[in-house]
Amino acid sequence: MASSNFFLPTALIALVATQAMAFDPSPLQDFCVADRNSPVRVNGFPCKDAKDVNVDDFFLEANLDKPMDTTKSKAGSNVTLINVMKLTGLNTLGISMARIDYAPKGQNPPHTHPRATEILTVFEGTLYVGFVTSNQANGENKLFTKTLNKGDVFVFPQGLIHFQFNPSYDKPAVAIAALSSQNPGAITIANAVFGSNPPISDDVLAKAFQVDKKAVDWLQAQFWENNHN
């Protein structure tokens, strides 16, 4: 009985610890403004000396009220990310945000955020959005999709492949996203697979995608852009 009584709280502690490690570490003081010039290398950034912190460490004139240029993007979108690299006061706070502009028929291509869940709301226009589950025991990857209108909200679970697409032929769309990490990261699937440096062997990709090497070589020869700013 004693061993049983010991096992349950131990298991619960292990479970809680596992969940805690799955997210950005919680702050242990009021704030920890990132010192990006420090030679110290840690997971995140060391803290700026508190006596040197000022109000501008928590402020950014981001101009998120203004439309962003989508004309230079093959995807027809522009992601303006506000993370700890742009706003040092976000360090240890476990949050960031982005404005996403979509040209007519533009998209934010299938991608993942390895370190963050994303919640998105539409400010203008209409978006067709979705995410795909991880590999399931039955071999399926289930797709969840929804058409969002102005004011609607949608959540993309951490690490899952997701996308947004503006179905309109003549109207742009705008969304604002919040992410549960100071530095969520983004892996655009096509870019990573076909635009890596050095390139992945076409033998590997031809077999993985069940196409011939010519198709792989053609894809690898394309210019794979980054629509995140």
Curated annotation (Swiss-Prot):
Residues 62-217 form the Cupin type-1 domain. InterPro entries: Cupin_1, Germin, Germin_Mn-BS, RmlC-like_jellyroll, RmlC_Cupin_sf. Glycans are attached at N78. It is found in: Secreted, Extracellular space, Apoplast. This is Germin-like protein 12-1. One of its GO terms (cellular component) is apoplast. It comes from the Eukaryota. Transmembrane segments: none annotated. Disulfide bonds join C32-C47. One of its GO terms (molecular function) is manganese ion binding. It comes from Oryza sativa subsp. japonica (Rice). May play a role in plant defense. Probably has no oxalate oxidase activity even if the active site is conserved. The keyword Secreted applies. Belongs to the germin family. PROSITE patterns: GERMIN. Mn(2+) binds at H111, H113, E118, H162.
